[in-house]
């Protein structure tokens, strides 16, 4: 593995500290996360129900995430990226990507 690469044989990739969002109690924790361009945000379903992580504008979607599943997405450009769980009205979050 070279510098900056994530993962390895038999090892699940992990997001850098501060770029993880937990799904529990039918909410995203934290509801808003701030990161830099090029970073990966990881969502982990720590709930007893399935969820999705779906861009509010429809441009990306995790698909069904059963309990224990996770989803990762890299954000390359600065901006505000709201998302929702399509199964649970009111379950929403935002990724803020700020220039360094």
Give the ranges of each region predicted by the language model.
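Short amphipathic beta-strand segments in non-cytosolic proteins
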Residues: 54-59
